[in-house]
């Protein structure tokens, strides 16, 4: 078999393939063997009918068509491997020559990853906002911890912000009760905003057994997007009493003996969270900076597939009702055209990021180890509240492991870029990225820079 590649565009190629007829002989033998098992010819045991009789029975052209159809995927895969192209999506295959006893010829057009001119990661400069852990941040965490150990006590007064109430709810549209919109004895924290819009405002000032009506827009169900009249009745009111933030509370709520030790620990926890958030901003800034510097041609078929998938998902959530989608968009102040344009822009950005990170991973020769995959598997399973083995089984069952592998490889690639880049906050202070992106390999530019600074310091000390 021989193949050649034509570059149709930076993101699309045509692979021309020629397969000598002799190379199809094993395919013919397999086809005859399978067919012989399925048919019975007088005088022959099942599976023993000769090929010539099968050809006479079913026709040589029909056999050729079957062999070619079954042979194309493997021959296409072989051509891809030999040409070292990186296909994206499924090919469009056209058989250009198919005659018994002669070579098989076909073409395969497919989108491919474009060649990208990538900058030196060491020349990349990234700047993000600084982080600061304030006393107010610590107070908020302490307040949240106190709330977890608080007690609820019934009160005989109107509802106030922060109270816990038991309520009955019902909703109507044009006087007709909305199915599934009735609830009794529902617990709710006033001011949390966890239920329907307008409820918290209606509850403030209400007393036990008092009812009040308000109008809200339904966000789910068959009446999503419509205005409904909601009636709320207060059945009970409780306030939360918080423990005093003292040493006794610290011993109750933590492993620490004093409130000062507890506050110090909370400060460290807040710092970790803020550093993690800053790391995400660093990652996003690194990708955005690279996207600005690198020209990335887009494979149209891949972008279109992603747009179609997003549109399908939006309609699926609305039972594929186009009119409901129009209603939802109208409530958001968007036209269908604006929605589709936004969806396409998001798809283009997403595809560009994937192409960029894949190219970086190739250039940096990123290798994904078992430990990397296990770490991602454990983190993702924790996020969804399931066991890692459950997630692994789901990924295998739905053929999603390759996607996870690719995602981990991209994460490792951008981490390597960040390790090599110069990362500072907007005040000009260097940010240590090792906590989330790993340490720079010894002997790189950062180590050389540290050595230079040490030499300068030694020289200065010697001159004093």
UniProtKB/Swiss-Prot annotation:
Q: Recorded E.C. number(s)?
A: 5.2.1.8
Its GO biological process terms?
'de novo' cotranslational protein folding; cell division; chaperone-mediated protein folding; protein transport; protein unfolding
Give UniProt keywords alphabetically: Cell cycle, Cell division, Chaperone, Cytoplasm, Isomerase, Rotamase
Top-level taxonomic group: Bacteria
The ranges of region (Disordered) come to: 431-464
Q: Name one GO cellular component term.
A: cytoplasm
Localization in the cell: Cytoplasm
Main location class:
cytoplasm
Molecular function as annotated in GO: peptidyl-prolyl cis-trans isomerase activity; protein folding chaperone; ribosome binding
Q: Which family does it belong to?
A: Belongs to the FKBP-type PPIase family. Tig subfamily.
What is the UniProt domain comment for this protein? Consists of 3 domains; the N-terminus binds the ribosome, the middle domain has PPIase activity, while the C-terminus has intrinsic chaperone activity on its own.
Q: What is this protein called?
A: Trigger factor
Gene expressing this chain: tig
């Amino acid at each position: 078999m021989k193949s050649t590649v034509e570059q149709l565009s930076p993101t699309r190629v045509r692979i021309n393939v020629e397969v000598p007829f002799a190379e199809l002989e094993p395919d013919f033998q397999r086809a005859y063997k399978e067919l012989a098992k399925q048919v019975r010819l007088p005088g022959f045991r099942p599976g023993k009918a000769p090929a010539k009789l099968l050809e006479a029975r079913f026709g040589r052209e029909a056999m050729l068509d079957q062999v070619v159809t079954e042979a194309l995927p493997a021959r296409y895969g072989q051509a891809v491997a030999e040409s070292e192209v990186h296909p994206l999506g499924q090919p469009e295959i056209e058989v250009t020559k198919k005659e018994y006893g002669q070579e098989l010829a076909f073409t395969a057009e497919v989108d491919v990853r474009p060649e990208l001119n990538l900058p030196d990661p060491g020349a990349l400069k990234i700047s993000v906002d600084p982080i600061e852990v304030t006393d107010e941040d610590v107070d908020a965490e302490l307040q949240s911890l106190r709330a977890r150990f608080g007690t609820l006590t019934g009160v005989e007064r109107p509802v106030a912000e922060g109270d816990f109430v038991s309520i009955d709810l019902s909703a109507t549209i044009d006087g007709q009760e909305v199915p599934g919109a009735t609830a009794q004895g529902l617990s709710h924290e006033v001011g949390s905003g966890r239920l329907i819009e307008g409820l918290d405002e209606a509850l403030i000032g209400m007393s036990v057994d008092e009812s009040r009506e308000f109008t809200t827009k339904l966000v789910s169900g068959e009446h999503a997007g419509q205005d409904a009249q909601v009636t709320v009745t207060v059945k009970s009111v409780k306030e939360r009493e918080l423990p005093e933030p003292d040493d006794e509370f610290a011993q109750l709520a933590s492993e620490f003996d004093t409130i000062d030790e507890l506050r110090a620990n909370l400060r460290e926890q807040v710092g970790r969270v803020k550093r993690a958030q800053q790391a995400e901003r660093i990652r996003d800034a690194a990708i955005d900076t690279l996207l600005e510097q690198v020209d990335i041609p887009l494979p149209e078929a891949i972008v279109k597939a992603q747009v179609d998938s997003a549109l399908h998902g939006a309609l699926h959530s609305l039972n594929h009702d186009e009119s409901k989608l129009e209603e939802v968009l109208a409530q958001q102040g968007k036209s269908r055209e604006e929605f589709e344009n936004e969806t396409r822009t998001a798809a283009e950005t997403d595809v560009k990021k994937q192409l960029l990170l894949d190219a970086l991973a190739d250039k940096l020769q990123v290798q994904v180890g078992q430990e990397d995959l296990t770490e991602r598997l454990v983190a993702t399973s924790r996020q969804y509240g399931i066991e890692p083995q459950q997630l692994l089984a789901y990924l295998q069952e739905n053929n999603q492991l390759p996607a996870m592998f690719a995602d981990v490889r991209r994460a490792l690639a951008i981490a390597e870029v960040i390790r090599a880049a110069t990362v500072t906050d907007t005040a000009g202070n260097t940010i240590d990225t090792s906590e989330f992106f790993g340490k720079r390999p010894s002997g790189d530019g950062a180590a050389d820079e540290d050595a230079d600074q040490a030499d300068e310091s030694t020289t200065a000390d010697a001159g004093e």
